[in-house]
Amino acid sequence: MRAIAINDYGTPATLTELPKPEPGPGEVLVRVRASSINGFDAAVAAGMLKGMMEHRFPVVLGKDFAGTVEAVGEGASRFVAGDAVFGVVMKPFLGDGGLGEYLVVGEQHGIARIPEGLDLQAAGALGLAGTAAVNAIDAVAPTTGEDVLISGATGGVGAIALQYAVAAGAEVIATARPGAEADFVHGLGAAHVVDYTSDLAAQVRAIAPEGVPAIVHLAGEAEQLAGLLAAGGRIASTLGFGPDQHPAAVAVMADPNPVTLDRLAADAASGALRVPITRTYPLEGTPQALADFTAGSLGKLAITV
């Protein structure tokens, strides 16, 4: 099978021919049709997870996947061949990924069916970013009329979190540079845009003099953001900023359980959630997609497998 893999720590991600995997007990074999680029993938490709997770080289990149079940292993019963599925690769080691034509995953976690109305490309860009966004918004639990500051609103997680905050009735203050970034977040429903390259605190205080009740920290300096909280406010961070650093902080780890994946898929299928794909690349274009992601990109960069 064709796959995008690295052969050692920090070596370039290249298109490689690898054996087709076989499902073991409780596993399903997915013919992958779509994936996307996440910060995790870029970190793995750069060798940044050396010593943090076991690497089984060649390491196929890609946390996200969407495709069709081709076969099931012994004892697997949630899915049958032909089911359209999507999800997040959740294994205790790095080696198997969604940026290959075939993928074996456990059937109990990190995988769900794709409903009618959701195409494979969108599903392939939804899993990890969508899960992180839902978990972060659930952690701060915005209510109608509340100001919510989303720092990192222009990325994949931020663009989805922004939409869920708006759906909850919140007034979203989104960080974005003037121009294309500001237009992007306004298009997703942001009520206010603050330029993170300027005096962020002054801009936020001009909108919310008493501070903001809720903050989603996806980028930027967490301590500076925490200083913008209103009394009794809460901050959710996907970057490790938690209660050890601030009593109002919750460190969020994306948990792609079937309930969350089903929620994301249903919202995307109904049109309530827009999967914010801004560019699509072929599998062999993944190295360019990684470079574009690292340089700074809007929304999600999708990969057709």
Language-model features: locations:
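C-terminal hydrophobic helical "lid"/dimerization subdomain
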Residues: M1, L261-V305
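Residues located in well-ordered beta-strands
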Residues: R2, T14, R31, A66-T68, ...
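Glycine-rich beta-strand-centered segment in the early N-terminal region that forms part
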Residues: P19-I37, L49-K91
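NAD(P)H dinucleotide-binding glycine-rich loop of Rossmann-like/cofactor-binding domains
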Residues: E54, R78, V88-G152
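Mid-domain Rossmann-like dinucleotide-binding core that forms the NAD(H)/NADP(H) cofactor-binding site
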Residues: A123-S198
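Glycine-rich cofactor phosphate-binding loops and adjacent beta1-alpha1 units
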Residues: D183-A251
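Rossmann-fold dehydrogenase core element
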Residues: G232-P276
